[in-house]
Amino acid sequence: MKFVMGLFLLVCQFFGPARLVIAADSKASWQAEWEQTVRAAEQEGQVMVSIGGYGAIIDSGVFQKTYSKIKITHITGAGTDLTQRISAEQRAGKYLVDVYNGGGNSLFQVLYQGKMLDPIKSALILPEVTDATKWWEGKQKYADKEGQYIFVYEGNVSAGAGAAYNTQLLDPREYKSYWDLLNPKLKGKILSTDIRKVRGAGIPWQFLYYYSELGPKYLRRLFGEMDVTLTADLRQAVDWLGTGKFAVGMPIQGGTVYKAKNQGLPVDEFSPYHFKEGVNLSSAFGSLALMNRAPHPNAAKVFINWLLSREGQTLFQKVISQPGDPRNSRRIDVPKDHIPPDEQRRDKMNYFDTDDPDTKDLNPAMKLLDEILAGKK
């Protein structure tokens, strides 16, 4: 017994210091890489970010204050415009943008499919960013099949099809499934934002088209049988809903309905977990990518790691969240007290993740809508 104990202590004495050296080397490795990257970024002097929707993150000045030797410049706008602009610049041989932050659909369809990105995964350096346990479900989310190019840092819970209703015309307790909205008494009383004309309407349409319990069969009945009115004017859609011209709007952006409700209009949304078919998990404008041939590659890495850090994600939630439209980072170590209980993510919930690459292509949905409407003429 004494021999075994002595052998155990001897092994501990021998391997213990080695383990400490390995741990120290590992720590020194990332620290050395980070310090070298920051020094190189300061020599580059600037970083150019194309950012859709979330310009307030940069306007806050926090990054500039933290990294005063790296001037951050940015351009904002609609994702479609920004990605098309980058595409045109690269075709002309101009590589001006370092980092793109914006909606996942335009990022995926234009920049990723156009092969204009470098792997962002290799740009992640800080342990608090690379540590998967800091992220929801213990993993980092990527919106590309390779799991390398489009980092998704936002995960908002939202009602699948983004349906809203007139509270004087409809009792939500009578409708537990999207199929219930095909009730003949609602014929001619449903309006919808037109996916072919409204920017930002893609997420609920992804759900309607790709969700297995709905899909083309449901859309054919909805638009083929229910005399749905299509509109490209979101404000008009909510006004029509509030005045009772229509009983249901699907999809309608939640923030628009929230404002109308607070103004006294008899409108409300179906809560995210209301319908039995499922719940969206969406990133809004919370997708991040590293441009290929970035003019300031080290500064790009510094910005990416900062934004994905606890500080960056806490700031993102703080400056982007609005009443009725909270933003939820996929980081689990940042505050969540601003998010209502019925919009919190739930463990072991089978969400329809709108950032899965197989559901990104909206062209089949638009083609189907054209086909259905053409058949009604």
Task: Name every feature range the model reports, one short phrase each.
Residues L219-G224, V228-T231, R235, L265-A294:
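Periplasmic-binding protein-like
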Residues Q31-E42, I51-K71:
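Short, polar/charged alpha-helical segment
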Residues V49, G93-N101, A247-Q253, D268-E269:
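Paired acidic/hydrophobic, glycine-rich loop segments that form the ligand-binding mouth/hinge
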Residues S50-G61, T73-S87, Y95-T243:
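Extracytoplasmic ligand-binding site segments that recognize negatively charged/polar headgroups
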